[in-house]
Amino acid sequence: MSQIHKHTIPANIADRCLINPQQYEAMYQQSINAPDTFWGEQGKILDWITPYQKVKNTSFAPGNVSIKWYEDGTLNLAANCLDRHLQENGDRTAIIWEGDDASQSKHISYKELHRDVCRFANTLLELGIKKGDVVAIYMPMVPEAAVAMLACARIGAVHSVIFGGFSPEAVAGRIIDSSSRLVITSDEGVRAGRSIPLKKNVDDALKNPNVTSVEHVVVLKRTGGKIDWQEGRDLWWHDLVEQASAQHQAEEMNAEDPLFILYTSGSTGKPKGVLHTTGGYLVYAALTFKYVFDYHPGDIYWCTADVGWVTGHSYLLYGPLACGATTLMFEGVPNWPTPARMAQVVDKHQVNILYTAPTAIRALMAEGDKAIEGTDRSSLRILGSVGEPINPEAWEWYWKKIGNEKCPVVDTWWQTETGGFMITPLPGATELKAGSATRPFFGVQPALVDNEGNPLEGATEGSLVITDSWPGQARTLFGDHERFEQTYFSTFKNMYFSGDGARRDEDGYYWITGRVDDVLNVSGHRLGTAEIESALVAHPKIAEAAVVGIPHNIKGQAIYAYVTLNHGEEPSPELYAEVRNWVRKEIGPLATPDVLHWTDSLPKTRSGKIMRRILRKIAAGDTSNLGDTSTLADPGVVEKLLEEKQAIAMPS
């Protein structure tokens, strides 16, 4: 695997990069051998009100999982993201907003964003929200979503952002679990030309008899669409901020005061409210942003993630703003109204750094050159990928077509629970291999272990664990520390278990193979679904694939592949045989799919993650309990897949 084609560091990157290979090695060694010294120094990336004396105080020990960083220091996140930039860079653009409709866009300076955040902070205080209260934010991708988040941080309220694609049931569950006192929403959201009934969803969520904590709903007017109104409870955003003062002194917060709760789907039971605190989280978000994207002042940065996901928290807002960057916020989708929309936005705003997801990349790849038609993308310097392992074919297409063969691709592996990047290239320090997340970030100590938790050395494959803490690590699950310990620290003692499997090659590069529960065991051989999917997608006629295991009398598990073809391609018996032979040739006979299920679309969450749990159930013919489908972008896909399944002959 180490013999795979390596992409060397381009000269234009090497000439001005923040970290070169020698610096990476020296800094990484210090970060794991002397974490107090290293993180004590790196913590200075922020402005502290009371400087910290203690740096690291952490334990992964069974029954005593405790994570504290900079615990005697005080600061305010919003002051670090706004106030400290005003004197020298107040007129610099903080947020470029690009609407769903390309004719709508605006630039908001640091000065203007600071004013809006102070006004909304005063509004929250007027509504009786105080330090420690939880505020639910259910908004579209508009600047006011950022204003609401920063205003919460400014007064010390804990925000719980709920992705705008979630159903009323999902919204209610998150409000109940966090006891939110206030909900901030919009009349409607806009996405790919369609309106999304956000206020109606909130109204429906609040009808749940178990929602008892909410006192008010603040509503932003985005479309002017018709909505129901409950006097006394519902309040217009514009009415409130008009009367609010633009003067506000940011609240002094302890580094370990809660900053936000973000719910992530559990494979079983209710969603998990991942809790991040203020100091360590922001140090880590700022430092990873600066070094992984090789950020230079003046760069225009675009992260396509929604604020409802951790990527939107750390790398659309907090990391970039802490560094004084210009961050682009996009309301739309990358391939609407034309497949070239993403490339058009890059050209329009002269984007230098683009961070998006493999799902978007594969969707554009299926369109071929239409995805870049009429654009030159010459402003781009760095590309990034997030959300799932990227298959080498999509990586190469992204590098070649979007980045004109000159932009390093930082393939970042991390999770909601990690707060920031864990395994990732650094543009000036890492030679790249398509499909590999490469090397750990500073302070991150990954290891591969076998099923008993024994460390595996050298080039090998196993479960990916982290053996010591890092500042961005989640501190607990909201209101359920026992579940936190059970979920992340009980599988392997004294280690954080990511739930992912990985392979390490001869160069020490890590290749994420997917969730450990996405590893198939075919005739005693372990096969990562990501590897089979990658082979399928490498076929010139295939746009997307998802592979699951189904029970098999002889092999233990058989391979069931859902396959979406490129536009203009049609399924046929000949293609069926061709695709099976293709995988056999790419990986070996063991990996040959037993079943190919042709389909137009896969069940995905709004963030583009494929819901494999549902695919496993459908493939196995188990439709008794498909679980929570409220997070699906298009719940109708499930019915369609079930219908298609009826016509498929299953292996015995």
Swiss-Prot record:
Transmembrane segments: none
Domain of life: Bacteria
Keywords: Acetylation, ATP-binding, Ligase, Magnesium, Metal-binding, Nucleotide-binding
Amino acids binding ATP: G387, E388, P389, D411, T412, W413, W414, Q415, T416, D500, R515, R526
Record's catalysed reaction(s): acetate + ATP + CoA = acetyl-CoA + AMP + diphosphate
Cofactor(s), by name: Mg(2+)
GO MF terms, alphabetically ordered: acetate-CoA ligase activity; AMP binding; ATP binding; metal ion binding
GO cellular component annotations of the record: cytosol
N6-acetyllysine carried by residues: K609
PTM summary: Acetylated. Deacetylation by the SIR2-homolog deacetylase activates the enzyme.
Keyword Metal-binding: yes
Record keyword Cell division present: no
NCBIfam families per record: Ac_CoA_lig_AcsA, PRK00174.1
Record's protein name: Acetyl-coenzyme A synthetase
Gene name as annotated: acs
